[in-house]
Amino acid sequence: MGGMMMGLEGKTGDALDLAFLDEMVIHHDGAVEMAQALLKGTKRPELIKLGNDIITAQTQEIQMMRNWRKAWFN
């Protein structure tokens, strides 16, 4: 967790908001990639559901954060 937080340390206001959005998009992209890899190999219904739920939710959140970034910082 410390590595993810380093990009936020010492920041406030717009700098914090921008760093948070950028880091969270990277974090969510990683989660989506992991879930996609899981779905290629697991046969467990619980993990299939979890993987699909992660892909759906975090893909939507990635788009939301990218839209906010564009609206607020471009």
What are these regions (language model features)?
Residues 1-74:
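His/Met- and acidic-residue-enriched segments that coordinate or traffic transition-metal cofactors
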